């Protein structure tokens, strides 16, 4: 293991330790400080008539869990960005030219996925978007991106939609893939031809257990297995 690898490993440990410690202290302090505030975070989450009949302890417990889940997700997103910055240039938006034909081609591909005319999806399905448009009717489009990463050493580009929970959203699988493909097309239009661009749909943990395959069929209807992290 090289010194550079060891240094990076220690840096990651330091980021994780600092992030978790800061989160725990801040989470405890914020909720204890707001306990008597009727407009505090927990007190604004307890007004559920169905939970209320179970008693005040259950009311506060469920509110605390909901607040923890939301706050933890925000912390993990920030921590992931800080870790990514050790190796990648990190951006959170993609903007550039997109042709009407590319937009239509993306829509047609998604329809084929929906009707299962193409199954299973593969990363080869959308490589035609690498062809730069020759038409003049280009529009500038901008997408917010969870993580647009550029490898500082290789120049490879990675577009990642990250879900902090263990469940990739079945209902939004199509719209997530559409946004990623449009970003893929924009980068293809603006970067040199041989630039590597990869697309991923990721989650912080696997609801089926780490190392086990995804079984969410709606997600796999639109995403290739090697696009799921």
Go through each PLM region and give its residues.
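Nuclease-adjacent, charged terminal/linker segments that flank catalytic cores
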Residues: 1-99
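Surface-exposed cleft-lining segments at the edges of enzyme active sites
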Residues: 65-66, 130-136, 164-171
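Conserved catalytic cores of phosphodiester-cleaving nucleases, focusing on short active-site segments
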Residues: 84, 145-149, 156-166
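Secondary-structure boundary elements
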Residues: 86-90, 150-156, 189-194
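Short loop/turn segments at strand-loop or loop-helix junctions that form parts
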Residues: 95-97, 152, 160-164, 203-205
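Active-site metal-binding core of divalent-cation-utilizing nuclease and nuclease-like domains
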Residues: 96-153
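Mg2+/Mn2+-dependent nuclease catalytic core
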Residues: 164-187
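Domain-level recognition of nuclease-like catalytic cores that cleave nucleotide substrates
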Residues: 169, 194-229
